[in-house]
């Protein structure tokens, strides 16, 4: 387990989205139920070792490595009708948050371009399954956020919102 010794070992956890550092020696995963990001040392792949975890102030939905940083899509929504989220930049070696960037909606996933210069964040603003049996459309709609990166870090000036409404024949007002 990757939980600290003083944590309830029976608490629910889940290594949902997994990424690897550029050297391939460390796995980093989002743990939504525990509101944390975990690290696994795989320098010896036959003997992986827990390498710690960092608790967060929200639900991590996705992780992606950019250079020596890990980008964390963090759901901070107050409710389904008041979605919120941030993109965190964490130094991999020090496991410390360097930056937080408001995304304006509930992120679902993050991916980094092969050259490490752009992160794409899918803003889902997930629907409420209890409303109208979860049928779409449901406001607010989602979108794509493109973020310019410099050495793996988010640059506030380089944030671009790309609307996705109107692209689908089914529920064109809801890009979820």
Language-model regions, residue ranges each:
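A short beta-strand motif characteristic of beta-propeller blades
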Residues: 1-10, 46-54, 96-101
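Surface-exposed loop and turn segments in beta-propeller and other repeat-based domains
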Residues: 1-9, 55-56, 151-176
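Beta-strand-rich domains and repeat architectures in extracellular enzymes and scaffolds
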Residues: 2-37
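Residue-level detector of Asp-centered blade-edge/turn motifs that repeat once per structural unit
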Residues: 22-24, 65-67, 112-116
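Blade-loop segments of beta-propeller domains
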Residues: 44-77, 103-104
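Short, conserved, GDST-rich strand-edge loop motifs in beta-rich repeat architectures
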Residues: 73-83, 122-142
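Beta-propeller blade signature
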Residues: 83-94, 136-152
């Amino acid at each position: 387990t990757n939980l600290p010794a003083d944590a309830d070992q029976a608490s629910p956890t889940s290594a949902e989205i997994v990424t690897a550092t550029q050297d391939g020696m460390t796995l980093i995963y989002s743990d939504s139920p525990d509101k944390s990001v975990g690290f696994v040392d795989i320098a010896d792949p036959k003997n992986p070792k827990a390498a710690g975890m960092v608790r967060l102030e929200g639900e991590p939905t996705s992780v992606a490595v950019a250079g020596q940083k890990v980008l964390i899509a963090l759901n901070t929504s107050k409710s389904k009708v008041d979605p919120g989220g941030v993109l965190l930049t964490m130094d991999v070696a020090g496991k410390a948050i360097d930056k937080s960037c408001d995304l304006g909606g509930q992120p679902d996933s993050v991916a980094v371009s092969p050259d490490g210069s752009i992160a794409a964040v899918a803003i889902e603003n997930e629907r409420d399954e209890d409303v109208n049996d979860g049928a779409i459309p449901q406001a607010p709609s989602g979108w794509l956020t493109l973020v310019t990166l410099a050495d793996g870090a988010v640059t506030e000036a380089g944030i671009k919102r790309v609307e996705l409404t109107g692209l689908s024949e089914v529920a064109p007002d809801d890009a979820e």
